[in-house]
């Protein structure tokens, strides 16, 4: 008799995706982040659902509804901080997941990669709208500054901004629609994740060598389920440490002041996971130029498969490319630091140099080094 997990119409989909899935025998811990992202998404949807039961999306009551959740709702403080710090965990896993794809050449699975880039944009949009909901000072001014960037679009810019705002400034209409979209997007993201996995399972996983591993595959369960559970425990431990010991470490103290349109905070800055892009935006002294650079800093991921010049897929056996990759990682950390600093000397020039280096590495140096390594190996 056939096992039910192989014959049942629904269970056989689960079986072929998570149980009997053939996986390369050599994939390292860098391949854990996909499953961790799935857990993060589930956690965010769950905590978000319970928060939405107590939250009100009206400018007069939004801030007080969040304090009510923290003070009066059973374990409301825990729900709120799990949701806020869960977003940070989500982005840590996202950036490591993308970094893994860059290092090991996983971007050559173009459909999976492009779907992943669209997912990254969707998650960033969701996180931005979520940051507006507590209606603190940084929520309000962050929303004002970032949405106002669209006014740099020639001809239609101003109309577009007022259309998004639902008025002539960030107000009730803006908060209500941001809440609606913030609630809706994670479910759309869940559907997109399924498409991402569908594309991945068409080709199978890449591995650290970058060489096809069809001759040496092992079942996903129990080998990688147990490996993923270890990663999960480590992430949950880090998240709980953050939530229970330093819940506000990654937040902005300004957001504990109710939104006040008449009082601008001295330093408007987004959450830490957007600081690198914010630094690139600020490094260009022109509004439209800054907006284009901001979009390009993420959209550049789409063209990475086109910039692959090496005859080897992975960077495992390419030491010069490895140096360049880690230079890029250090550059992104530098940009993240600069994004949180005031606009004054020497931060301005450091940010400009780091921004130039970011695009230079990806567009010019990586492809050239790939060609050079081919030549060194006499290919």
UniProtKB/Swiss-Prot annotation:
Iron recorded as keyword: yes
Gene Ontology MF: a single term: ubiquinol-cytochrome-c reductase activity
Keywords: Electron transport, Heme, Iron, Membrane, Metal-binding, Mitochondrion, Mitochondrion inner membrane, Respiratory chain, Transmembrane, Transmembrane helix, Transport, Ubiquinone
Membrane topology per record: Multi-pass membrane protein
Gene3D superfamilies, per the entry: Cytochrome Bc1 Complex, Chain C
GO cellular component terms given for this protein: mitochondrial inner membrane; respiratory chain complex III
Main subcellular localisation: mitochondrion
UniProt-listed GO biological process terms: mitochondrial electron transport, ubiquinol to cytochrome c
Recorded coiled-coil stretches: none
Note on how the cofactor is bound: Binds 2 heme b groups non-covalently.
Residues the entry annotates as binding heme b b562: 83, 182
Entry binding sites for heme b b566: 97, 196
Location in the cell: Mitochondrion inner membrane
Cofactor(s) named in the record: heme b
Domain of life: Eukaryota
Family designation: Belongs to the cytochrome b family.
Assembly and binders: The cytochrome bc1 complex contains 11 subunits: 3 respiratory subunits (MT-CYB, CYC1 and UQCRFS1), 2 core proteins (UQCRC1 and UQCRC2) and 6 low-molecular weight proteins (UQCRH/QCR6, UQCRB/QCR7, UQCRQ/QCR8, UQCR10/QCR9, UQCR11/QCR10 and a cleavage product of UQCRFS1). This cytochrome bc1 complex then forms a dimer.
Job description of the protein: Component of the ubiquinol-cytochrome c reductase complex (complex III or cytochrome b-c1 complex) that is part of the mitochondrial respiratory chain. The b-c1 complex mediates electron transfer from ubiquinol to cytochrome c. Contributes to the generation of a proton gradient across the mitochondrial membrane that is then used for ATP synthesis.
Protein name: Cytochrome b
Gene: MT-CYB
């Amino acid at each position: 008799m056939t096992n039910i997990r192989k014959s049942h119409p629904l269970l056989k989909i689960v079986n072929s995706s998570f149980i009997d899935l053939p996986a390369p025998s050599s994939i390292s811990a860098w391949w854990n982040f996909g499953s961790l992202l799935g857990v993060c998404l589930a956690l965010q949807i769950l905590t978000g659902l319970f928060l939405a039961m107590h939250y009100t999306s009206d400018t007069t009551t939004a801030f007080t509804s969040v304090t009510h959740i923290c003070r009066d709702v059973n374990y409301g403080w825990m729900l709120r901080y799990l949701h806020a710090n869960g977003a940070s965990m989500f982005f840590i896993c996202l950036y490591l997941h993308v970094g893994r794809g860059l290092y090991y050449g996983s971007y050559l699975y173009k459909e999976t990669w492009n779907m992943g880039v669209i997912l990254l944009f969707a998650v960033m949009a969701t996180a931005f709208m979520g940051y507006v909901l507590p209606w603190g000072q940084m929520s309000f001014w962050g929303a004002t500054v970032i949405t106002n960037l669209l006014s740099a679009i020639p001809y239609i810019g101003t109309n577009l901004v007022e259309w998004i705002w639902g008025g002539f400034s960030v107000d009730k209409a803006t908060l209500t629609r941001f809440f609606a979209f913030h609630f809706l997007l994670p479910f759309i993201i869940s559907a997109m994740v399924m498409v991402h996995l569908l594309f991945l399972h068409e080709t199978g996983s890449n591995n650290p060598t970058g060489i096809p591993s069809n001759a040496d595959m092992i079942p996903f369960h129990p080998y990688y389920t147990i490996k993923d559970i270890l990663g999960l425990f480590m992430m949950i431990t880090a998240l709980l440490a953050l939530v229970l010991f330093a819940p506000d470490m990654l937040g902005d103290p300004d957001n504990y002041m109710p939104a006040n349109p008449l009082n601008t905070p001295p330093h408007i800055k987004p959450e830490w996971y957007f600081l690198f892009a914010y630094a690139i935006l600020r490094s260009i002294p022109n509004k439209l130029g800054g907006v284009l650079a901001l979009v390009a800093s993420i959209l550049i991921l789409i063209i990475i498969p086109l910039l692959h010049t090496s005859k080897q897929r992975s960077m495992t056996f390419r030491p010069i490319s490895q140096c360049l990759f880690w230079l890029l990682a250090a550059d992104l950390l530098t940009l993240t630091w600069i994004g949180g600093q005031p606009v004054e000397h020497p931060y301005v020039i450091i940010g400009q140099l780091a921004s130039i280096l970011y695009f230079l590495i990806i567009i010019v140096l990586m492809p050239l080094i790939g060609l050079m390594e081919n030549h060194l190996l006499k290919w």
